[in-house]
From Swiss-Prot:
Protein name: D(1) dopamine receptor
SUPFAM superfamilies xrefs: Family A G protein-coupled receptor-like
Disulfide bonds: C97-C187
Segments in the Cytoplasmic topological domain: 46-61, 121-139, 220-271, 331-363
Signal peptide: none
Phylogenetic lineage: Eukaryota, Metazoa, Chordata, Craniata, Vertebrata
Family, similarity comment: Belongs to the G-protein coupled receptor 1 family.
Gene Ontology biological process terms, A to Z: adenylate cyclase-activating adrenergic receptor signaling pathway; adenylate cyclase-inhibiting adrenergic receptor signaling pathway; positive regulation of MAPK cascade
Organ and tissue specificity: Retina.
Organism: Carassius auratus (Goldfish)
InterPro entries: Dopamine_rcpt (IPR000929), GPCR_Rhodpsn (IPR000276), GPCR_Rhodpsn_7TM (IPR017452)
Length: 363
């Protein structure tokens, strides 16, 4: 009977290990595709701006290239190390943990702040186009970009290297695990309450509030401009109808004009909804958890109130935003032509040369 129990236990354990191995392989494949797509998309953006002068000449593209660099750094300095940890089941890089945490905070914050700067740039370009043309020089753009990167460095490396970010260890095991002279296979990135709230405000909540305000104003301005243009078009059509004495078709022409106006407004709304929707869906769940975890108590058996797996899933959701940004922000007609040339597929993908997409770029 004991032999039977032992055999049954062995079968169950081997089945569990096989299932766990399969999950790790699938996870590794999925994360590899995500990392490679992030690298490819953002490398293409950087290469396009570097190679084609007409893309470099537009100041608004300075912000796009800064965003691409920050997302490229996420794919190089942050994602691969975490992917290896997910597959291996432990942190194999030892003392590199603190530097990696600092890179994670810096690159993710830089990506989000660059998105915020882009929204401000586009609002300024649409709300005051003549003033924008005079004032938005390469120097002003570099100052705005430098501000985003400086804030990202200040909020990451200084607190992490000085250990201001860490939650106080609780219990004997955590105190021992925090000692430098003991090896650890876990990269503990748990934050204290002060740092979790302050960093989340700077890295996400304030930028997302600015983006909501700017894109709402952009939609209102675009809506007014579309309706003004449609009114002028209808007036011109009415004058033409009266001149040609073709009153019978006036209602049909006016109806088609209203439909065209509605279509234009819907197009702008869809573009803005995609921009904000993708960003919020990727990052909001993580930052909600980031602020919750330091305040929630551990369960009676000592486990964290939010499982590490759940937290890791939402961390990857946030990083996935870096793979989507090149599609959203650098997929207008100019960039698509450049991508087609770089990839050598002008003949294979002619749609990339001629197709138009709604874009909020000024130029």
């Amino acid at each position: 009977m004991a032999v039977l129990d032992l055999n049954l236990t062995t079968v169950i354990d081997s089945g569990f290990m096989e299932s766990d191995r399969s999950v790790r392989v699938l996870t590794g494949c999925f994360l590899s595709v995500l990392i490679l797509s992030t690298l490819l998309g953002n490398t293409l953006v950087c290469a396009a701006v570097t190679k084609f002068r007409h893309l470099r000449s537009k100041v608004t593209n300075f912000f796009v290239i800064s965003l691409a660099v920050s997302d490229l750094l996420v794919a190089v300095l942050v994602m691969p190390w975490k992917a290896v940890t997910e597959v291996a089941g432990f942190w194999p890089f030892g003392a590199f943990c603190d530097i990696w945490v600092a890179f994670d905070i810096m690159c993710s914050t830089a990506s989000i702040l660059n998105l915020c700067v882009i929204s401000v740039d586009r609002y300024w370009a649409i709300s005051s186009p003549f003033r924008y043309e005079r004032k938005m020089t390469p120097r002003v753009a570099f100052v705005m970009i430098s501000g985003a990167w400086t804030l990202s460095v200040l909020i990451s490396f200084i607190p992490v290297q000085l250990k201001w970010h860490k939650a106080q260890p609780i219990g004997f095991l955590e105190v021992n695990a925090s000692r430098r002279d003991l090896p650890t296979d876990n990269c503990d990135s748990s934050l204290n309450r002060t740092y979790a709230i302050s960093s989340s405000l700077i890295s996400f909540y304030i930028p997302v509030a600015i983006m909501i305000v700017t894109y709402t104003q952009i939609y209102r301005i675009a809506q007014k401009q579309i309706r003004r243009i449609s009114a002028l078009e209808r007036a011109a059509e009415s004058a033409q109808i009266r001149h040609d004495s073709m009153g019978s078709g006036s209602n049909m022409d006016l109806e088609s004009s209203f439909k065209l106006s509605f279509k234009r407004e819907t197009k702008v709304l869809k573009t803005l909804s995609v921009i904000m929707g993708v960003f919020v869906c990727c990052w909001l769940p993580f930052f909600i958890l980031n602020c919750m975890v330091p305040f929630c108590k551990r369960t009676s058996n000592g486990l964290p109130c939010i499982s590490p797996t759940t937290f890791d899933v939402f961390v990857w959701f946030g990083w996935a935003n870096s793979s989507l940004n090149p599609i959203i922000y650098a997929f207008n007609a100019d960039f698509r032509r450049a991508f087609a040339i770089l990839l050598g597929c002008q003949r294979l993908c002619p749609g990339s040369i001629s197709m138009e997409t709604p874009s909020l770029n000024k130029n």
